[in-house]
């Protein structure tokens, strides 16, 4: 009792979860040490051995759990306790029956998302090195199931891979609905699943759920950190498509700007089917609606003040003398100048739409204001179509195949050789995920799915084509995007 009191005082300074963990460990060790002494020949034996087995199971110490369960069976003739002991042994046997070298894979290989599933599978196959496998070389096995992009198929796939194929872990799925359904089932069956989806909050489904994919919130946070923190842009405009994608990124960007102390000066949406964006752009710079007289007067005063500071930029004072009221009337009839009170413009749309939108800005007398975008901008076609209008644009990316990294270069060359096409982010992500898991299996210390889960958290020595991969305590990959900028006719990594 005195030892337990001392332990309680010691644990009081820690967070509740650590104090509980410490207490459980202490009790387990104490019970294990004195079990024979206190349990021999009395009615408490089954209770003690059952508690020991339960604690060891929770700690994933299966050898000790098995020993305690067998002691439980031997300690009593009562059928109730014997049955509990056998159930524990069956559970241990089931946990140890997984195939540590076998990985399950859930991808949409048919249906509307098949093209994305196939690209991901290409990367996974390349990562398994199936094209250069030497005879007799140890390798992991991949069991693939087609989700068809449907949540129901994803759930069935998890059940089959976990209960029948007995895989150690699962990669996938890709699509949002399939991923959330598969994650919930994987958590229920206590099998690690590394999802490849952008779905926010998916790792909240449980401790067995991981994600290896760049999520929008991290991408925008990185973009704003560069724009506000380093380039010192402060004022922003947002021009976004009236779609779920556009609205999502508009809100994400706006929230991020607010959090970092920036300002949103203009926000306009457009119909995704539009090809003329003059109205929206004019609204952003005060050219669409009649200007109040107070604003007109303020702009005139600003213009006079600027002329006094920079007289060489103003008109010759002798010019127009003698024209009197005619000159003033002509000045009033001139098209007003745009009010560009922002330092950058954020457009969350794909490269095809951006190529249509960008030329409208100089056409409406808006020059030298850089664009910010999303990873959907990443295409050489954007530069081919509208390169002159998107110079200095910045956007995040999860993978840059033109990187000078040897790791990336070798991956791109191997992918082209085997698939006769260039890899994208999905192929790169699939490649890195399977390589990461291969390295875990190669360590040879994994016996159960819980072991595998713990190794995922602890492994921090993998550098792949999408960057360094480690996972935080919530199962989210800790990986920053690269920021790309357009200079001349090429994309470059922003230093």
Q: What are the residue ranges of the model-derived segments?
A:
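Extracytosolic ligand-binding ectodomains
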Residues: 1-10, 30-495
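An internal, amphipathic alpha-helical element
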Residues: 9-28, 32
């Amino acid at each position: 009792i005195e030892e337990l009191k001392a332990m309680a005082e010691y644990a009081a300074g820690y967070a509740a979860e650590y104090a509980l963990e410490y207490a459980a460990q202490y009790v387990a060790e104490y019970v294990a040490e004195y079990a024979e002494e206190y349990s021999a020949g009395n009615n408490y034996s089954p209770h003690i051995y059952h508690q020991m087995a339960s604690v060891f199971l929770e700690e994933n110490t299966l050898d000790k759990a098995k020993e305690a369960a067998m002691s439980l069976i031997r300690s009593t003739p009562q059928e109730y306790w014997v049955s509990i002991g056998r159930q524990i042994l069956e559970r241990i046997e089931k946990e140890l029956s997984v195939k540590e070298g076998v990985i399950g894979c859930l991808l949409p290989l048919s249906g509307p998302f098949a093209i994305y599933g196939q690209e991901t599978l290409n990367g996974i196959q390349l990562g398994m090195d199936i094209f250069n496998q030497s005879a007799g070389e140890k390798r992991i096995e991949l069991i693939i199931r087609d989700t068809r992009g449907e949540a129901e198929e994803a759930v069935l796939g998890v059940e089959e891979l976990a209960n029948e194929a007995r895989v150690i872990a699962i990669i996938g799925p890709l699509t949002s609905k399939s991923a959330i359904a598969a994650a919930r089932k994987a958590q229920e069956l206590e099998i690690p699943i590394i999802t490849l989806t952008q779905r926010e909050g998916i790792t909240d489904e449980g401790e067995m759920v991981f994600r290896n994919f760049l999520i929008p919130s991290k991408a925008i946070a990185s973009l704003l950190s560069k724009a506000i923190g380093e380039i010192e842009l402060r004022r922003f405009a947002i021009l976004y498509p009236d779609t779920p994608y556009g609205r999502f990124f508009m809100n994400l960007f706006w929230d991020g700007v607010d959090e970092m102390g920036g300002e949103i000066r203009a926000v306009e949406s457009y119909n995704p089917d539009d090809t003329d964006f003059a109205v929206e752009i004019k609204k952003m710079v005060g050219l669409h609606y009649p200007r109040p007289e107070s604003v007109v007067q303020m702009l005139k005063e600003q213009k006079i003040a600027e002329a006094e500071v920079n007289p060489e930029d103003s008109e010759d004072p002798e010019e127009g003398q003698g024209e009197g009221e005619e000159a003033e009337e002509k000045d009033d009839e001139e098209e007003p100048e745009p009010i560009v009170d922002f330092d950058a413009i954020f457009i969350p749309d794909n490269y095809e739409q951006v190529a249509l939108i960008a030329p409208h800005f100089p056409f409406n007398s808006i020059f030298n204001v850089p664009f910010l975008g999303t990873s959907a901008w990443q295409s050489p076609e954007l530069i081919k179509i509208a390169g002159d209008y998107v110079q200095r644009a910045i956007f995040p990316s999860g993978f840059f195949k033109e990187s000078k990294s040897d790791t990336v270069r070798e991956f791109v060359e191997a992918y082209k050789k085997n698939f006769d096409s260039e890899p994208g982010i999905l192929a790169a992500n699939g490649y890195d995920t399977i390589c990461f898991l291969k390295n875990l299996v190669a360590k040879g210390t994994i016996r159960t799915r819980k072991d595998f889960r713990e190794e995922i958290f602890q492994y921090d020595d993998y550098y792949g084509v999408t960057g360094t991969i480690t996972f935080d305590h919530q199962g989210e990959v800790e990986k920053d995007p690269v920021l790309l900028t357009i200079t001349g006719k090429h994309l470059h990594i922003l230093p």
